[in-house]
Structures are given as C-alpha cells and as structure tokens.
Amino acid sequence: MRKNLIKEVSKFYNKSGWIIKNNISTDANLFEDLRKNSKHYIRLCRLRINKHIPKKGTNILDFASGPIQYKEYLSYSKNFAFRHCVDFSKDAIELAKKKLKSKGKYYHKNFFRIKFEKNFFDCSISLHTIYHIHKYDQKKAIIKLLNITKINSPVIVVYSNPNTLINKFKSIINYKNKKEQKIYFFCHPIKWWQQFENIADIKLYPWRSFSSQHQKIIFPNNIIGKFLFKIVFYCEEKFSNFFINNFQYYFIVLKKKKLS
C-alpha cells in the first residue's frame, strides 16, 4: 500500500497537479481559497513562518517544494545562498527552476532515497506535505528532517489538526463527506508530536483556522468576509493555543537538541 500511495501522489502531481491555466495551478484550484476577500488574510498566514526562519544561512531545504507557487513561499529563502527543492513532480521542479535559477538546488526524487549530509541545512521547511505521507512513515520523515538539519536550527512543518471543532460537529450530526479524496491524507492528533521531545525542542503555532472548503462556506466574498478574516487573524495571534487545538492548520517548529 505504501508504494502505491507514493505512486498515487506522484501520478496526480505529474499528470495534472501543476498544470497552469489562467496563471492558476490545478493544485491551487482544488485546495486553495483564491477569492479576493481572503487574499490578504492568506498572505499574512503564509508569512507567519518567516518569524521562525533564520535571518541568514547558506542552505534551506524545501521538502515537497512544488513550483514555489506563491510569492510568500519565495520569501522563505531570501536570506539563504541556496534553496534545495525536493519534489516528485518534474513539472514542479522545472517551474521552481524558473523562479530560483542558480540559487536553487533541485531533486526530482523520493525524499527518503536522497542521501543528504547530517547537520547540513540551516533550516528545513515542509508545507502541507507530511500528512500526504503514509501514516506509518510520517515519523520517519520527521526524523530524517531533524537528522539533516543543524542542531538548534528550525525544522518547520505545516500540519493539520484532525480534531477541529468543525470535525467534532460533523461527528455529532453523523455527517459524511461523499466527495472523493484526490490524494492520500492522514493527520495524527496533536499529541503525536510529543514523541520527538527527547530529541528536539518543539513549539506549535497557528497557521490557518479553516480549510479552503470551509472558508468558502463561512466567509462571504465581500467586504464583510474581509472584515471577518481580520478578526480571525487577530484572534489567532491573541489566543494561539485555543486555535491550535480547535481549528484546522498549525505549524510545528522543531529544533534538534545537542545530545550528550
């Protein structure tokens, strides 16, 4: 099943995921809220991790980089000499090359098969990727990211919470989503991250409160929706623990400890 899963994800992104129509990818059309009212909020959410990325460094790893499709994503490597992009999709790598040019290092390979040096990267990022890896291999991915990133340097992972208030409400009313899942998706509960506490310092932060699907339902595409997004962003910053534990997306910053 695990090999089939890799083929499934690879097939989607090599066949259609990064096809661009009207400057928008299939991936963005499927998984992002592209409406005008949400634009500023989503931009601020994407920029959140810049607070945790080192101000300078030589090498930053982008695991499952895609084509670096948003301007905010491009900003993550602005203070580094090289951005190392790993992705299953040849199209994604080719598009990333056009943006990074000689500043990029490119790997059209399976992440688990690439032999990176230990303690090589000054920072590693993985956005919306780990939960598309088989649930029994996600730990392996985090361990590898920690191994190849320097001691006390950040490994930043954007992940999803399976126990949101919306999901709890759905379970109460016995709601079942009949929409076919495009690619594999499995999220461990937040406490899953505690297993890494013996090898890394771990901190959690809110990323975005709602999936794009729910945003489109809850927030109207007008000035009222835009105002509501401002309130949500303020509350995420003010009451971070509540939003991490009860809403959709959060990110984890892991810093490998120096073990004696």
Predicted features along the sequence, with ranges:
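A conserved beta-strand element that flanks and buttresses the S-adenosyl-L-methionine
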Residues: 125
